[in-house]
């Protein structure tokens, strides 16, 4: 899937001709021309015309052999968000289907959020809800994210790290759960390159050194197996596949091992025509080499929920090193590479029951999203979705031998509600592997779980919400209490909220006004206060969440008063600046004009950075970057105060700020000289420079430079990145 080549629209459409009819090609061409017109005069951060991006997204979807509406959605995916085009325009020009796909990947706009995190969580929730309606929404989004990751080098480093983190947390696991390994691998490897370039390039260089040795080893294995397979007249394809960089990195981190301690760096993959041949080849492999205990997995008999099927075994290979072998049919291989996309791939005359079977296989995903939708808080929604969708899984059995997949950490309560809500509600105990266990017992892969029920049970306990790990179980427990005890929940919720308000040290009469209560109920999407209190009563939302919203105005006022009091206690009566004098630091404390302010040397903030003030003892306010570790501690949080950069006209001219940067690159002759020359071209003064190289030929250059503002810094960083063999450039703290 990795592909640095920039495709033209003509190349994408020519690729699509290999499997689409002329009528559908005309539909796709129309979508491209519409997008080209809408994005005219728009450019990306790289400086290239914006339409290049939708073309590449559509190209990725064509590689997956998607249907015409999905490809059209790829061309059009940004027109509603970034141009004057509306969803109604798309419905009229194309279809309801195309408009729905574009809407699913369009971010929420024109709504104010408290934080970027909240906005991002709301955008993700919207996307996942749309995805529950049509899985093609996420295929377009994954193609969009894949191309954005391929062009990440054009963005500032902070944004690169944020997007890479989000990719590893959400999009790569999602590609994995949907079985699209081609996209998953590239997303993971690219994200690692930006998050930990030193380790990434170290692994790359080490793998390059041993490539020839590995290829000889694979040839030896393949030749031996090929000879045996041909003897029994089985047709097979063989390939040696090196492990992906991110999977090696994860293994090094999780197992606390060095690269030279990781032995299974490659796998041999064998593709055959039938399931019978898969097991026959497995027998041949185990005849040639001794299998390692506990390393055989039969995903043919027990497919993964993302529809992946294969036989995996690890044997002690010819030279005594572990060797992983994967055996599957050609059809299984298509599913392994393209997952859910293989089922959506455009096929003339696709059988109706085939689609229905596929929909049934993905019903688990829709169920999870349905339970997630109950949450009124978008960030809470995303956190619990990560648990249900993206955490490691355990596979347990019912007494009849059916396999149930649950997130790691699940307990018998999660199991019982996964079977049926009535079984969950009537649960009185559980047996695991024939032994009685408590309801908070952690389940492990291979456990046989039996749920004990009683028709005389009064239902679940409120405490079960805290014990359960899955959203499905939590949702069903809350639903039970919601239906059974509304009046009781309303009264209980009201008492809990009032108790929290008192704990926050506010008077109930000042806070619980009808206008304020209704305003907060609206914020939580409840039609009235009783619904809100009932939700608190059955643990739908917490009393503290409601109390915090109810006291928001009063807390801000109290915080301001306490802040002013701390300033007076800590700094005494600061000397006012002489009338008309401009501040040297260029920073002012919000709401207070006469405090001594200085820039901290630990993180060296510069104009344009997000900053915060720290109240020192007797030395005024020290200004730090918001991401400075020194202001992240619990102790520091109590002494923070809002500050802001002043306009240039109010500042005594301070021409230069000291900033340190770290440059990683391939250690070759002349590299340092080229870096110094590049910095000089940006008219930037250098105060110090040092460099070192490790045995993997990775050069690390530390440089202190004087810059005027954040834009000046970005200019320097971008210029250095243009140098051949530079891996990364990042700003560092002392």
UniProtKB/Swiss-Prot annotation:
Pfam family, one: TGS
Residue spans of biased composition, Basic and acidic residues class: 552-567
PROSITE patterns (UniProt xref): ACT, HD, TGS
TM helices/strands, residue ranges: none
Phenotype upon loss of function: Decreased growth rate; growth is almost completely restored in a triple relA-yjbM-ywaC mutant.
GO annotation (BP), single: guanosine tetraphosphate biosynthetic process
Cystine connections: none
Region (Disordered): 552-584
ACT domain residues: 660-734
CDD domains in the cross-refs: ACT_RelA-SpoT, HDc, NT_Rel-Spo_like, TGS_RSH
Enzyme Commission numbers on file: 2.7.6.5
Enzyme class (EC, first level): transferase
Description of activity control: Activated by the cyclic di-AMP (c-di-AMP) receptor DarB in the absence of c-di-AMP.
Domain of life of the source: Bacteria
Pathway: Purine metabolism; ppGpp biosynthesis; ppGpp from GTP: step 1/2
Signal peptide range in chain numbering: none
Span of domain TGS: 392-453
Catalytic reaction equation(s): GTP + ATP = guanosine 3'-diphosphate 5'-triphosphate + AMP
Molecular functions (GO terms): ATP binding; GTP binding; GTP diphosphokinase activity; kinase activity
Keyword Transferase: yes
Job description of the protein: In eubacteria ppGpp (guanosine 3'-diphosphate 5'-diphosphate) is a mediator of the stringent response that coordinates a variety of cellular activities in response to changes in nutritional abundance. This enzyme catalyzes the formation of pppGpp which is then hydrolyzed to form ppGpp, it is probably the hydrolysis activity that is required for optimal growth.
Annotated family: Belongs to the RelA/SpoT family.
Protein name: GTP pyrophosphokinase
Organism: Bacillus subtilis (strain 168)
Classification of source organism: Bacteria, Bacillati, Bacillota, Bacilli, Bacillales
């Amino acid at each position: 899937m990795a592909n640095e080549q920039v495709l033209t629209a003509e190349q994408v459409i020519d690729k699509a001709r290999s499997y689409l009819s002329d009528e559908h090609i005309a539909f796709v061409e129309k979508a491209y021309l519409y997008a080209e017109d809408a994005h005219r005069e728009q450019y990306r951060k790289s400086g290239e015309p914006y339409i290049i991006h939708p073309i590449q997204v559509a190209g990725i979807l064509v590689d997956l052999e998607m249907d015409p509406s999905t490809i059209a959605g790829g061309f059009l995916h940004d027109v509603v968000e970034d141009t004057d085009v509306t969803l109604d325009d798309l419905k009229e020009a194309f279809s309801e289907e195309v408009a729905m796909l574009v809407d699913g990947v369009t971010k929420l706009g024109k709504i104010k959020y408290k934080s970027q995190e909240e906005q991002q969580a709301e955008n993700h929730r919207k996307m996942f809800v749309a995805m529950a309606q049509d899985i093609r929404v996420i295929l377009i989004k994954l193609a969009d994210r894949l191309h954005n990751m391929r062009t990440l080098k054009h963005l500032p480093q902070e944004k690169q790290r944020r997007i890479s983190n989000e990719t590893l947390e959400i999009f790569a696991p999602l590609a994995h759960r949907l079985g699209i390994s081609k996209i998953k691998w590239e997303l993971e490897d690219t994200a690692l390159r930006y998050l930990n370039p030193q380790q990434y390039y170290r692994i790359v260089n080490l793998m390059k050194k041993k490539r020839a040795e590995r290829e000889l080893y694979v040839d030896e294995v393949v030749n031996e197996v090929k000879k045996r397979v041909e003897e029994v007249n089985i047709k097979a394809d063989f390939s040696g596949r090196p492990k992906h960089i991110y999977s090696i990195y994860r293994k090094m981190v999780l197992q606390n091992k060095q690269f030279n301690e990781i032995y299974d760096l490659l796998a041999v993959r064998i593709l055959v025509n039938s399931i019978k041949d898969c097991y026959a080849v497995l027998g041949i492999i185990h005849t040639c080499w001794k299998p390692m205990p506990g390393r055989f997995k039969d995903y043919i008999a027990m497919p993964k929920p993302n529809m992946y099927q294969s036989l995996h075994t690890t044997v002690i290979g010819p030279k005594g090193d572990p060797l992983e072998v994967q055996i599957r049919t050609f059809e299984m291989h298509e599913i392994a590479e393209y997952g859910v996309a293989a089922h959506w791939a455009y096929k003339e005359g696709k059988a109706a029951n085939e689609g229905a079977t596929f929909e049934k296989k993905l019903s688990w995903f829709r169920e999870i999203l349905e339970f997630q939708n109950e949450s009124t808080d978008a960030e809470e929604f995303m956190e619990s979705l990560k648990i249900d969708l993206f955490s490691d899984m355990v596979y347990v059995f019912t007494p009849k031998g059916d396999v149930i997949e649950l997130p790691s950490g699940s307990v018998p309560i999660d199991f019982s509600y996964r079977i049926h809500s009535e079984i969950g509600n009537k649960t009185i105990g559980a047996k695991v592997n024939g032994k009685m266990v408590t309801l908070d017992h952690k389940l492990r892969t291979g456990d046989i779980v039996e749920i004990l029920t009683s028709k005389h049970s009064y239902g679940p306990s409120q405490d079960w919400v805290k014990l359960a790990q899955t959203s499905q179980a939590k949702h069903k427990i809350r639903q039970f209490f919601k239906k059974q005890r509304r009046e009781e929940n309303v009264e209980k919720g009201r008492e809990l909220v009032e108790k929290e308000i008192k704990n926050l040290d506010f008077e109930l009469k000042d806070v619980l006004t009808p206008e304020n209560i209704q305003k907060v109920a609206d914020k939580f999407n409840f039609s009235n206060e009783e619904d809100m209190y009932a939700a608190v009563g059955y643990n739908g939302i917490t009393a503290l969440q409601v109390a915090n919203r109810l006291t928001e105005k009063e807390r801000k006022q109290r915080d301001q008063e306490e802040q002013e009091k701390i300033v007076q206690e800590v700094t005494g009566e600061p000397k006012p600046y002489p009338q008309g004098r401009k501040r040297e630091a260029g920073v002012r404390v919000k709401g207070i004009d006469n405090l001594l302010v200085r820039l901290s040397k630990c993180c060296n903030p510069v104009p344009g950075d997000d900053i915060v003030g720290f109240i020192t003892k007797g030395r005024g306010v020290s200004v730090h970057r918001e991401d400075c570790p020194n202001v992240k501690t619990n102790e520091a949080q109590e002494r923070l105060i809002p500050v802001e950069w002043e306009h240039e006209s109010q500042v005594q001219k301070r021409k230069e700020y000291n900033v340190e940067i770290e440059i990683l690159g391939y250690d070759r002759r002349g590299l340092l000289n080229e870096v110094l020359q590049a910095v000089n071209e940006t008219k930037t003064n250098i105060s110090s420079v040092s460099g070192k190289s490790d045995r993997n030929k990775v050069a690390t250059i530390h440089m202190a430079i004087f810059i005027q503002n954040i834009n000046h810094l970005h200019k320097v960083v971008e210029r250095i990145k243009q140098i051949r063999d530079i891996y990364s450039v990042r700003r560092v703290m002392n």
